Amino acid sequence: MKVRTNEEVSKALAEHKPVIALESTIISHGMPYPQNVETALKVEAIIREHGGVPATVGIIDGEAVVGMTPEEIEEFGKRGLSIPKVSRRDIPVIIANKSWGASTVATTMILAAKAGVEFFVTGGIGGVHRGAETTFDISADLEELGNTNVTVICAGAKAILDLPKTLEILETKGVPVLGFQTDELPAFYTRKSGLKVDHKLESYAEAAEIIHAKRDFGLDGGVLITNPIPEEYSMDTDAINAVIDSAIKEMDEKGIKGKECTPFLLAKIAEITGGKSLESNIQLVFNNAAVGTEIAKEYYK
């Protein structure tokens, strides 16, 4: 089964031009309509402004799509939470039932790789959830990063996670964790986590050379490029950690588990911060889109 690409994406791939994959969970689960559609189209516009071709990824009527039309993005936004989040395990069911599915980081990587897209920009990856030593709640995103040949540009793992354990799993999976002009892992809403990345990238060109080296040497798996949130949108570390702790406590009390955890926590954090965390989330995605496209341009030189 092939993935469907739109004309713009197909042409760019044929001409070895930078195509940037984008997930659709941020549209369906990340924020309400019409803000979700406006944000998705703005991210696409930023990629174009920097000389790349955006490819928003999802499953529509059972068809895997890499490069949605604006009309499809609009419909995705309107359907919102009624569209299920789809990770690797869910893809066969959604395709067989000819349903709609919102692509997580893992699914976006799978479909991007099938279409021949090397680069994928997102907000933050999933990882090891707090308390995973008893719940075993570990995102499938980490497994995908270990196996699938896509470079992911993000602002680190989502701050609601156990970041030290997430780094340990990435090390086990052989995933290089690179920091764009930082030697410290960004923590999504904040620029610093107190944890070191594997290597600090000084330039777009250096990032491109490292990706080429991994591909040319035949090492399967992803490359993770972490890019800190812009300073002006960074949140106070102590304040956001207190909010996250409060949100996790409420989630545990309500018995929320599995793939419902992340949407609940992000929405609760946005509620407690009066929307500031959502604004930070949007701005870091915009920033990642710009940086990711510049790296992709260097890669295809």
Model-derived features: positions:
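N-terminal basic/disordered segments at the start of proteins
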Residues: 2-13
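Solvent-exposed alpha-helices and their adjacent loops that cap or buttress functional pockets
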Residues: 11-14, 19-20, 111-114, 119-121, ...
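General beta-strand structural signal in soluble alpha/beta enzymes
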Residues: 20-22, 55-59, 101, 119-124, ...
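Glycine-rich nucleotide/cofactor/substrate-binding loop typically near the N-terminus or early
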Residues: 24, 29-31, 37-92, 216-232
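A generic, well-ordered mixed alpha/beta core segment in the N-terminal half of proteins
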Residues: 51, 71-121, 125
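Active-site glycine-rich loop that binds ribose-phosphate moieties when present
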Residues: 104, 133-146, 150-171, 205-209
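Anionic-ligand binding region
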Residues: 191-216
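A C-terminal functional module that forms or caps the active site or interfaces directly
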Residues: 219-287
